[in-house]
Amino acid sequence: MEGLQVLVRQAKVPVWLPWPLPTGWLVSGFTGAGDERTGTRGSAVALSGPNPLGGPADMLIIAEEPGVGLGAGLAGLPGLDPGDGFAACQPHATVKVAHHEAPLWLVESHGKAVFVGEVAASWLWLVLWPDTAGTLLVEPLPLRDLRDPAQELDLPFGALSPRLPA
């Protein structure tokens, strides 16, 4: 919990968390990207829980300034950003942020569902394993920025996610 509080204090981008958490889901890790000079310009929160279609599932929610590459790296995609043409069609999913819906587009990937959009002038990535866990986004997923003041959330923590670098 202390490490998450440090990330929240230092982050220049949102630290997103679905809230309320989907039923049975736990926070399973977090990380940031940046340096002492520029600060934390990317954040990722890992979650684990039941796949709506059966079996276990993992999810990473990443926020980053353009050009950081944390989302693409954690999604196993080339480059730093989602790439050209990712938003060339109707959105495939939405998230709810502060009573507004933000569109997300599916980015081609193998074995996982990768959704990308833009919220608060930052890239927002949702990466879900296996790809069938993407059904969690059939309805808009409500997200909260853990940097927002006056939040007393009792977060349930689980085992560390293997989806984040050690």
Model-derived features with residue positions:
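Proline-anchored loop/turn motifs at beta-strand termini and strand-loop-strand connectors
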Residues: 17-28
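Short, solvent-exposed coil/turn segments at beta-strand boundaries
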Residues: 22-24, 52-54, 118-123
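Glycine-centered secondary-structure boundary/capping sites
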Residues: 10-14, 73-75, 121
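Short, solvent-exposed recognition patches
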Residues: 26-106
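N-terminal cysteine/histidine-rich coordination modules
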Residues: 1-12
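A short, solvent-exposed beta-edge/loop patch
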Residues: 88-166
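Intrinsically disordered, low-complexity boundary segments flanking structured domains
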Residues: 11-18, 46-47
